[in-house]
């Protein structure tokens, strides 16, 4: 059995095969996922797993150089948005590299998911709790 934090085999494979600038979307239970993009559905029930739990695991297993979020996330769900911001700042401190944050409209965000290697669906039911991670390099 694997000892590290990430146990889900599909997600583990995805993280292990990321190249520089590849993108992963982590989304709430309601974001439409394009048929053309691989779906990794972790949702069990409302809130399980949470958006932040999933973000933390992905951050612990991969190097992220930038993120994209919808402008609406900060406006409509400021508490969870602030929690994501704190996680990103903590990751910057841990890895010693900046993580750029880009804000776009929710409609543009949905279109951008088409560029993701995969969309990871959580059980999160907070509006606009979605983020696109762009992979960095560890060196």
From Swiss-Prot:
The keyword Cytoplasm applies. GO terms for cellular component: cytosol. One of its GO terms (molecular function) is D-ribose pyranase activity. It catalyses: beta-D-ribopyranose = beta-D-ribofuranose. Pathway: Carbohydrate metabolism; D-ribose degradation; D-ribose 5-phosphate from beta-D-ribopyranose: step 1/2. The keyword Aminoacyl-tRNA synthetase does not apply. SUPFAM superfamilies: RbsD-like. It comes from the Bacteria. Its main location: cytoplasm. It is found in: Cytoplasm. The active site is at 20 (proton donor). HAMAP family: D_rib_pyranase (MF_01661). Homodecamer. NCBIfam families: PRK11797.1. Catalyzes the interconversion of beta-pyran and beta-furan forms of D-ribose. This is D-ribose pyranase. The lineage of its organism: Bacteria, Pseudomonadati, Pseudomonadota, Gammaproteobacteria, Vibrionales. The gene is rbsD.
């Amino acid at each position: 059995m694997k000892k590290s934090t990430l146990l889900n085999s599909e997600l583990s494979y995805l993280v292990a095969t990321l190249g520089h600038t590849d993108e992963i979307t982590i989304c709430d239970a309601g974001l439409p996922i394009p048929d053309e993009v691989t779906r990794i559905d972790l949702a069990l029930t409302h809130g399980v797993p949470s958006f932040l739990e999933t973000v933390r695991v992905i951050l612990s297993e991969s190097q992220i150089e930038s993120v994209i979020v919808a402008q609406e996330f900060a406006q409509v769900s400021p508490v969870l948005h602030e929690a994501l911001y704190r996680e990103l700042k903590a990751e910057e401190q841990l890895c010693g590299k900046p993580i750029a944050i880009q804000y776009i409209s929710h409609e543009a965000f949905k279109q951008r998911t088409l560029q993701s290697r995969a969309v990871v669906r959580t059980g999160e039911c907070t509006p606009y709790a979605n983020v696109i991670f762009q992979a960095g390099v560890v060196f």
